[in-house]
Amino acid sequence: MSSKKVQSPKEESIAKMLICKVHIGTKNLENKMKRYVYTRAKDGVHILNLAKTYEKLQLAARIIVAINNPADVVVVSARPFGSRAVLKFAQYTGAQAIAGRWTPGMLTNQIIQKFTEPRLLIVTDPRTDAQPVKESAYANIPVIALCDSDSPLEHVDIAIPCNNKGKESIALMYWLLAQEVLYLKGTLPRSKPWKVMVDMFLWRDPEQFELKNLAIEETAPAAPHLAENQFATEAPYEEWNKKEEWNDNANEEWKNPIAADEW
């Protein structure tokens, strides 16, 4: 009998990263990201080292767990592919999610209504989320960022090397980070797998849903046509042409009053 090899959590996570193309970088390379690059492909695309990705993921999860109040962690994504991922991450970890446009001054301007003072900031891309990263430097807030091979590391404290442009990669990274946070908090035992699928963190195009619903409506069978006689509830034509009126009997009663001795 051939015994099946049981993968370690690290091997299992790296296998999922390979499937979701977390290791695929870009053709451009930032100087400070060289330490995270494993090799360069023939087409010029840089391949990231997934072993270092896993290590930085573990470190980021420990930093998140060290914060007593989960609401003091703010997760940001201006990139559409990361909007659903940050919302789901906030749902399962208790953090605050800001998906979409960042309002300038949220970390520095105390006058605005959306002003917040988090203890930790997590961004999906330090290039597209440059405004919150810059404000965190003024407010002395540590930053954890998903960094590609061309991502600037200025004001970034913990860089997790990964593909931060693909929707599958972003969904998996936030799923792994949320899973590790739940493991470290003791909410989820390591002996049992997390029942939440990675698909829950995956971004979905609303236009595709509309097209899918239209296709379902077109392929659906039409409603059965009912005959006209099934709705014939009106009285026959002859009844409407009768010369009698409903008050004829009443007129005769008034003409012939009842005798007094009949009362």
UniProtKB/Swiss-Prot annotation:
GO cellular component, one term: cytosolic small ribosomal subunit
Keywords from the UniProt entry: Cytoplasm, Ribonucleoprotein, Ribosomal protein
Record note on quaternary structure: Component of the small ribosomal subunit. Mature ribosomes consist of a small (40S) and a large (60S) subunit. The 40S subunit contains about 33 different proteins and 1 molecule of RNA (18S). The 60S subunit contains about 49 different proteins and 3 molecules of RNA (25S, 5.8S and 5S). Interacts with ribosomal protein S21.
Single GO MF annotation: structural constituent of ribosome
CDD domains documented for this protein: RPS2
GO biological process, one term: ribosomal small subunit assembly
Similarity comment text for this entry: Belongs to the universal ribosomal protein uS2 family.
Gene source species: Plasmodium vivax (strain Salvador I)
Intracellular or extracellular location(s): Cytoplasm
Function: Required for the assembly and/or stability of the 40S ribosomal subunit. Required for the processing of the 20S rRNA-precursor to mature 18S rRNA in a late step of the maturation of 40S ribosomal subunits.
One Pfam family hit: Ribosomal_S2
Name by which UniProt lists this protein: Small ribosomal subunit protein uS2
InterPro entries: Ribosomal_uS2, Ribosomal_uS2_CS, Ribosomal_uS2_euk, Ribosomal_uS2_euk/arc, Ribosomal_uS2_flav_dom_sf
PROSITE patterns: RIBOSOMAL_S2_1, RIBOSOMAL_S2_2
